[in-house]
Amino acid sequence: MFSSYSLCKCLVSFHILAIQVLISCASSLNLTNEYLNHKCRKYQPGSEYEKELNTLSRRVATLDFTDGFTHRSNSRDTKSVTIIFQCRGDSYRSKCNSCYATALAGFRSRCPRNKGGIIWYDQCFLDVSMINDNSPRRMNYDNIFSMHNPNNVRGNVNSFNKKTTEFLYKLIGKADRLDVDGINFLYYAAGEMRLGKQTLFAMVQCAKDILSCKDCLEWSIKELSKCCDGKQGARVVGTICNLRYELYPFLRT
């Protein structure tokens, strides 16, 4: 059985009007790592930049991804290379390493000889750039897009939208708080909620180096109202934060 997903909106620098991603549902738990989207920039083959990129990408591959995130740079002035990589909150350690390998291979395939680019998968994203800045990142509206399930909700659409939005805001409150040690922000929350005879599954997540997780996620919820009212599933995806809801389980528990 297949369900299709549509890339319904791209902001600023995306010139893709629509895309459909087929997600194979092999079991009741729909765990996939489908390619979602990408964007690229060019560089010269055999350049010093390419050598630095190869060096840094190999270094990142050796990480254990305990928290599923890294922001690393090779500082060489104009030859600087920065990699930002994050896994979905339920994918870490070996699963995160596997997603990094997939994302890196996908980046090299879709962005050959590119001086930076971003590629998104279900379970991770990879951002390669020349920006040598490890300071906390602000909201970036250039690299955000939304996707939705083409199927509409049956019944009271307004009630579904309202309850879904309220649940997402509840998850934001859980994600935008400190961990049990009171040191780091969690920046991830997931849960489920009964909606009559159906169950709503949802998650919210921010990058570990963002200045304001709450602001990014609240902005993303507003985007849902523009693209995805009454849809059985939807997501807003970026490199700063992302959120998703479905009427089927899609996360590891």
Curated annotation (Swiss-Prot):
Protein name: Putative cysteine-rich repeat secretory protein 33
InterPro entries found in the cross-reference section: CRR_secretory_protein, GNK2, GNK2_sf
PROSITE patterns assigned to the protein according to its UniProt record, in alphabetical order: GNK2 (PS51473)
Pfam assignment, any one: Stress-antifung
PANTHER family, A to Z: CYSTEINE-RICH REPEAT SECRETORY PROTEIN 34-RELATED, CYSTEINE-RICH REPEAT SECRETORY PROTEIN 38-RELATED
Gnk2-homologous domain residues: 34-133, 141-250
Protein family according to the UniProt entry: Belongs to the cysteine-rich repeat secretory protein family.
Record field: transmembrane: none
Gene name for this UniProt entry: CRRSP33
Organism: Arabidopsis thaliana (Mouse-ear cress)
Matching CDD domains: Gnk2-like
Predominant location category: secreted
UniProt keyword annotation of Secreted present: yes
Keywords on record: Repeat, Secreted, Signal
Cellular localization per UniProt: Secreted
Signal sequence annotation: 1-28
One GO cellular component term: extracellular region
